[in-house]
Swiss-Prot record:
Organism: Caulobacter vibrioides (strain NA1000 / CB15N)
Matching NCBIfam families: rpsL_bact
CDD domains: Ribosomal_S12
Protein name: Small ribosomal subunit protein uS12
SUPFAM superfamilies: Nucleic acid-binding proteins (SSF50249)
Taxon lineage: Bacteria, Pseudomonadati, Pseudomonadota, Alphaproteobacteria, Caulobacterales
Family stated for the protein in its record: Belongs to the universal ribosomal protein uS12 family.
Amino acid sequence: MPTINQLIRKPRSPKPVRNKVPALKGCPQRRGVCTRVYTTTPKKPNSALRKVAKVRLTTGIEAVCYIPGEGHNLQEHSVVLIRGGRVKDLPGVRYHILRGVLDTQGVKDRKQRRSLYGAKRPK
């Protein structure tokens, strides 16, 4: 524990703020090309096959991104738009792919929360 005098001489330095989405370089979204589309399994209490894609961004960075919703049409060389937002039970997945934008189709037969999944209003 420092003395008051030591703190006056050299005050405490604030902890540096760590960027949670470095690949976006301060932008809300970024465009990229899928280099690999695959499934992976989540951390311990959960069990599933989560759909993820490795994306090479326009910044030149490769990021692992989650594909939300049921079913998707992504394959290698698909052009996608990604946003920040991690997946809690997938380590290393810090980005989400936006549905219904560029080469990604919206989720079929989606009735609620449609805007998040790029689904049109049902007739």
